[in-house]
């Protein structure tokens, strides 16, 4: 039942350094595409785009 969950847990990775920094949930019905947010990356020490990894 978890495989068809409407709100799965996803991991966000930094676009610059590829480090996986954040874990969040998303709604598959509202956001079927890959999620992208601007978050702080401690490795880059800057606000960078973080994209959903699969």
UniProtKB/Swiss-Prot annotation:
Coiled coil: none annotated. GO terms for biological process: translation. Keywords: Ribonucleoprotein, Ribosomal protein. One of its GO terms (molecular function) is structural constituent of ribosome. Pfam families: Ribosomal_L33. GO terms for cellular component: cytoplasm; ribonucleoprotein complex; ribosome. InterPro entries: Ribosomal_bL33, Ribosomal_bL33_CS, Ribosomal_bL33_sf, Ribosomal_zn-bd. The keyword Ribonucleoprotein applies. SUPFAM superfamilies: Zn-binding ribosomal proteins (SSF57829). Belongs to the bacterial ribosomal protein bL33 family. NCBIfam families: PRK00504.1, PRK00595.1, rpmG_bact. This is Large ribosomal subunit protein bL33B. It comes from Streptomyces coelicolor (strain ATCC BAA-471 / A3(2) / M145). The gene is rpmG2.
